[in-house]
């Protein structure tokens, strides 16, 4: 099975916990015989619209996009709004019906919705959203679990 992992920042440029967790998940899938391609924006101003690199055994497709981390709100909003457009423009020539068997994408970036939809339609596959920041406090506040369950 070939999975596309989509996240708004990734190793080695990111030290954020989300990128580390997704990398560990990718390595686990690879250890179980699957193939993983991470699709992520470049944090550096790259000259190519798409750079393909390997990190450990994970294929990483970095597309050119403006910064979305550690920048002002207006700049971040513009760059996040353009993420799906920039990603699809960069990867569309590499994505065929048989490229991916599934998509795993990491919240909270709602701006990947159009990209996920395009890949799902092209590859006729399912997508799975990894929700974060809902446990434990959100679940307690919503009354789903009690503070004693932690």
Question: Would you name each region that the model predicts?
Answer:
Residues 18-19, 80-84, 150:
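A conditional alpha-helix N-cap/helix-loop micro-motif detector
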Residues 10-11, 43, 67, 110, ...:
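Short, glycine/serine-rich, charged loops/turns that create anion-binding
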Residues 39-94:
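A conserved catalytic-core segment of Leloir-type glycosyltransferases
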Residues 84-91, 100-125, 129-132, 137:
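An aromatic- and histidine-rich active-site surface loop
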Residues 18-21, 51-53, 75-76, 117-120, ...:
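Short, glycine/charged-enriched secondary-structure capping and boundary segments
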Residues 8, 68-75, 98, 125-150:
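Acceptor-binding helix/loop patch of EC 2.4 sugar-transfer enzymes
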Residues 15-16, 47-48, 72, 113-116, ...:
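Short glycine-/acidic-enriched loop or helix-start segments at secondary-structure transitions
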Residues 1-59:
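N-terminal subdomain of nucleotide-sugar transferases
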């Amino acid at each position: 099975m070939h999975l596309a992992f989509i996240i708004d920042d990734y190793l080695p440029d990111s030290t954020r916990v989300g990128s580390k967790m997704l990398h560990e998940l990718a390595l686990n899938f690879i250890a179980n015989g699957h193939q993983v391609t991470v699709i992520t924006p470049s944090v550096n101003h790259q000259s190519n619209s798409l750079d393909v690199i390997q990190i450990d055994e994970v294929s990483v497709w970095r597309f050119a996009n403006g910064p979305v981390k550690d920048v002002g709100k207006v700049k971040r909003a513009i760059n996040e709004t353009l993420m799906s457009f920039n990603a699809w423009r960069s990867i569309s020539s590499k994505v065929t019906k048989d490229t991916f068997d599934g998509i795993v994408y990491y919240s909270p970036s709602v701006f990947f919705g159009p990209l996920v939809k395009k890949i799902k339609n092209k590859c006729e596959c399912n997508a799975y959203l990894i929700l974060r920041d809902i446990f434990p406090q959100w679940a307690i506040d919503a009354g789903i679990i009690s503070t004693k369950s932690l």
